[in-house]
Amino acid sequence: MEVKAIHRGARISAQKTRLVADQIRGLPVDKALNVLTFSPKKAAGIVKKVVLSAIANAEHNEGADIDELKITSIYIDKAASLKRFTARAKGRGNRIEKQSCHITVTVGN
């Protein structure tokens, strides 16, 4: 039994989020939540919400026992970027890309 939760369009870059995802891949959910709780990174809070959602999906939809669950897969995909301009000297402008990503977490036995 595998249950997944997806967060689409998270407003943080995929590169920064993958650093957090690599730390919890394959861990039991209780240890993964512990790692995410004490991580100082912004991405840890976002990934933690997705992991909690996947746990709730497994418990509610499949009637799974939380103690037996582990993170079977977690992957981060790049999403659409927001294009913005910032003013520079002499009437010029520079383009800024605000990155976003899709977070997919799968939990199972």
Curated annotation (Swiss-Prot):
Entry annotated with the keyword Acetylation: no
Chain coiled-coil ranges: none
Annotated GO CC locations: cytosolic large ribosomal subunit
MF terms (GO), sorted A to Z: rRNA binding; structural constituent of ribosome
A single GO BP: translation
Protein's UniProt keywords contain rRNA-binding: yes
Record's keyword terms, sorted: Ribonucleoprotein, Ribosomal protein, RNA-binding, rRNA-binding
InterPro entries named among the record's database cross-references: Ribosomal_uL22 (IPR001063), Ribosomal_uL22_bac/chlpt-type (IPR005727), Ribosomal_uL22_bac/org-type (IPR047867), Ribosomal_uL22_CS (IPR018260), Ribosomal_uL22_sf (IPR036394)
Domain of life: Bacteria
Subunit structure: Part of the 50S ribosomal subunit.
NCBIfam families per the UniProt record, alphabetical: rplV_bact (TIGR01044)
Function field: This protein binds specifically to 23S rRNA; its binding is stimulated by other ribosomal proteins, e.g. L4, L17, and L20. It is important during the early stages of 50S assembly. It makes multiple contacts with different domains of the 23S rRNA in the assembled 50S subunit and ribosome. The globular domain of the protein is located near the polypeptide exit tunnel on the outside of the subunit, while an extended beta-hairpin is found that lines the wall of the exit tunnel in the center of the 70S ribosome.
Family (UniProt): Belongs to the universal ribosomal protein uL22 family.
Name recorded for this polypeptide: Large ribosomal subunit protein uL22
Organism of this sequence: Paraburkholderia xenovorans (strain LB400)
